[in-house]
Amino acid sequence: MPHETLLDNQGWFKKLARRFGPGHVVNTCFLIVMLFSTLLTWREVMILKDAYVASQRNHLGSVANVLDRQLQFNMDRLIFLRNGMHEALVAPLAFSALQSAVTQFEQRRVRHFWQLELDKRRTLPLYGVSDQFVARTTLLSRESRDLANELTATLELGYLARLARSSAMLTLETMYVSRSGFYLSTLPTAYGSDIVSRYYQYVTQPWFIEQSQRRNPQRGVRWFTSAQPYVTDEQKKVTASLPLDHDNYWYGVLAMDIPVASLQRFLRDAAEKDIEGEYQLYDNHLRLLTDSAPEQQTANTLNDRERALLAREIEKDTLGGLRLGTHYVSWERLDHFDGVLLRVHTLREGIQGNFGSISIALTLLWVLFTAMLLISWGVIRHIVKNMFVLQNSLQWQAWHDPLTRLYNRGALFEKASRLAKRYREARQPFSVIQLDLDYFKSVNDRFGHQAGDRVLSHAAGLIGSTIRAHDIAGRVGGEEFCIVLPGATKAQALQIAERIRQRINDKEILVTKSTTLRISASMGISSAEEYGDYDFEQLQSLADKRLYYAKQSGRNRICASDATQEREKK
């Protein structure tokens, strides 16, 4: 029993040794060491990456907080004005000046344009249009029972808007636009037809139209940026608007224009100490509003594909980061602006920074260690290379006929079937030529098999040198060949077949030391365009059938259609 066990163990070790030879052992050891060194390096890289991402978010967060606080200050002012006007609308003051303004409105409301002003030093003027102008659209209306209260509340708003002005504000203009045909603005309007055009411009802006109860059921602050190019004499701006409602009735819209230039100056000041990275402010449609790049420097803008990738990420979270080519983009949604702030960090800035220096040192260490392993692996690489050469040689022998050096039957059918499927999907022509050497058996009988082999090799060489570069040819039987012509119509296949026939027929072969021989070939042609059938076996069978008829018709000829056969029979 022990002797039998020893034999079993020896057999098991031999099997293991055959499967895992010296080359495999060295390769396995190399891979294990390489794997562990790579894993350790990768762990350090991931830690470094997390630290880099956290650093980018911290830089972005500090600038975003400063910008958000400034925007919050402006939004609080807008809400304060709305609340003050709402209180004035619910409980209007019984001042004689306000009552007098209501009387003046009743007298002037039919005019094409009009103006009401209580005190030039303490309040803002009220501008309006006629009843006829208001009646042109259903968006506007003077049918409110609280029209007088709204008018006095707007005049009171003039006091608040003048008092609320501050040098710390980013706003260019604050205005209230009523659906009843009047407006109040911190920017004066020249008395005249400009009042009508300005009111029309206000009520046709998206920030006014989109504040209806149907389009803004939440009745909160909304931000708007114009999708159309700005005219040359008007600076680019964004608008925050807030509806005024009471008892489920929409009176008008309070709005605040913020110049993009003000946002740019504020953004540059906030990012002044951050020498790396560029900050960019986008609206809710990911249109670039402004950036912190110096005037002489071009901003790193995003292309359409990058914006689409960023939009998908923004939908998932309020902040994050994304690698876009050679840029790392960290982003954060602002709480008091319907948009997103980006920090774009380029690869050059990353390399020049602290994280770049650490990354370079870590990479060099890994490269040096890997180089040492690769040097020790050189001998095995040479062995593997020899194995590949042997494998390729065996593969060639498995796919080719050793005598003619063309594809054998199995390889030809496999490659031709794949080509036929591809050309069928592309709806391109596909043709097949079946070729047979005439009277080949008599060559073997008269001159021997060596002469027959010489004839086959000679014919294969002529076929290979005549067909196109992307055509394939193979030996499918004794003296029978098949030529696949992808992309060739039936007419083109006929031309190629004729060239092959002529070349074979024109060349003489030296079969013995003193004997030459001239051979000929018969061919049959089939094409997918005839019946719309791309099945290679069917095409080869049809070509073989026509080859048989070509031999019956006298040999050294080509048969390309069934119609030719019928004509020859008649």
Swiss-Prot record:
Location of this chain's protein in the cell: Cell inner membrane
Cofactor note: Binds 1 Mg(2+) ion per monomer.
Keyword Transferase: yes
Residues under site feature: Transition state stabilizer: 441
Enzyme class name: transferase
Pathway in which the depicted protein is active: Glycan metabolism; bacterial cellulose biosynthesis; Purine metabolism; 3',5'-cyclic di-GMP biosynthesis
Gene Ontology BP annotations: cell adhesion involved in single-species biofilm formation; cellulose biosynthetic process; negative regulation of bacterial-type flagellum-dependent cell motility
Cofactor(s) this protein requires: Mg(2+)
Binding site for Mg(2+): 436, 479
Subunit structure: Homodimer.
NCBIfam families according to UniProt: GGDEF, PRK15426.1
The protein, known as: Probable diguanylate cyclase DgcQ
